[in-house]
């Protein structure tokens, strides 16, 4: 399903009757609504960042809900799409704190390839309807992913922005890992 070590780690989930039933509901949502990201990008974060290579996890809430924005990575948008305010604020903090100049694109694919798992807690959303799939069942999978990452021997940095993401800290108990929390980067959260 993914094409890397996540397949074996998540096999127990993929093969469970509960997940199959849940994923059927997701497929029905795609048939009857405009849903983002495109279906072939739902698991893009896992495809681009293997379990073995994950060094940083940035937890988002759910995908952007505008046309052409979401492509399976939290806080990231496809090339050619204007940089969203949340990501502009992330870039501003990187510049202010570390002197890293802001990127000219909102596509964070390179971050993912370098070991930053850009994981939304909810992996799909209906067009123009934020949080529309929040109660659908994605969090069973994504919470399990966070618990698997907690088991890693190598230290992992978990970046939890906003109250929604901070709730995930309860799954991170390994003292080797670092949890960084702060308000959500959205200008509406300030």
Where would I find each of the regions flagged by the language model?
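A polyanion-binding, active-site-adjacent surface
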Residues: 3, 11-160, 164-173, 178-183, ...
């Amino acid at each position: 399903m993914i094409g890397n070590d996540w397949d074996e780690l998540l096999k127990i989930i993929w093969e469970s009757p509960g997940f199959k039933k849940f994923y059927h509901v997701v497929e029905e949502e795609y048939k009857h609504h405009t849903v983002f990201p495109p279906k072939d990008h739902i698991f893009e974060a896992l495809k681009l960042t293997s379990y073995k290579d994950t060094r940083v996890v940035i937890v988002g809430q759910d995908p952007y809900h505008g046309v052409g924005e979401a492509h399976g990575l939290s806080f990231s948008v496809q090339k050619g799409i204007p940089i969203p305010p949340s990501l502009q604020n992330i870039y501003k903090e990187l510049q202010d704190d570390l002197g890293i100049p802001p990127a000219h694109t909102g596509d964070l694919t390179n971050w993912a390839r370098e070991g930053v798992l850009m994981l939304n807690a909810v992996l799909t959303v209906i067009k123009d309807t934020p949080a529309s799939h929040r109660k659908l069942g994605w969090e069973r999978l994504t919470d399990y992913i966070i618990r698997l990452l907690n088991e890693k021997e190598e230290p992992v940095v978990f970046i939890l922005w906003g109250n929604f993401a901070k709730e995930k800290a309860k799954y991170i108990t390994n003292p080797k890992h670092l949890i960084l929390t702060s308000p959500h980067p959205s200008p509406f959260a300030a």
